[in-house]
C-alpha cells in the first residue's frame, strides 16, 4: 500500500528534511520510527526539501509498505517512536503511483516576522526579528506584484540547479502580508519554488516595509533577473511550510 502522511516538525535541530551524510535530518529520524513500527525501512518521498532550520506545519510524504496497521492508527504508533519536535498528524492510503512531490498542485509557505526592538525569550526560534517599524500596507502592495507567472531568477540563491538549467519560471497564485500586533506574516502560494525564493521574497518585502525600496520597483527587479537587486535572504528560522495541496484530493489539509 502507498501511504500519504502529514507531518509537523520544528526544524531547529535538523539539517533539513533530506537525508544528509553528516547531519541529523527529519527524514532519517522518521525512517527510524518507521522501522520500529513496521519492521522495515521503506524509501520515503517528501513533498519538499526544506533546508536546515526550516519548520513545517503540514509537510507531506509518502511511502510504500505492507502492514496490517490501519492508516488511522499510524499517527499514534509512529509518534510513540518520534522525538517531540516531529509529529505525524494524519495518514491515508493513496494510489500506488502517487508521489508526494510530483503530484503537488501548490505549496504554501509562511514567513513570520517579529517587528519589535526587543526579542521575545519564548519563541525567538520561530520568527525573524526586525527592530525597525515595517509598513505592512506598503509590503502588501509590493506582495501583489509577485503574483502571476514570472521568471524569479532575481529571487534565487546562487548555486541553484534550476538556475543552471534555465528553469526559473514559476507561478505565484497568492502572496499577502498580514499584521497582528508586533507579528507580521508573509504567506506565499505557488506551483513551485527556487532555492531560497521565499526567504529572498520576504527579505525584499521587508526592504519595502522599511522604506528602502518602493512597491513599484518589484516588476523591474523581476524583469532584470539580477539577484543583487532584490532584498536579503532572511534566516531559515522564520520559515514554515504551511500546507501542500493536491488536485482532486479531498481533505487536502489533513
What is each PLM-predicted segment?
Residues 1-254:
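Structured-RNA-binding interfaces characteristic of tRNA pseudouridine synthases
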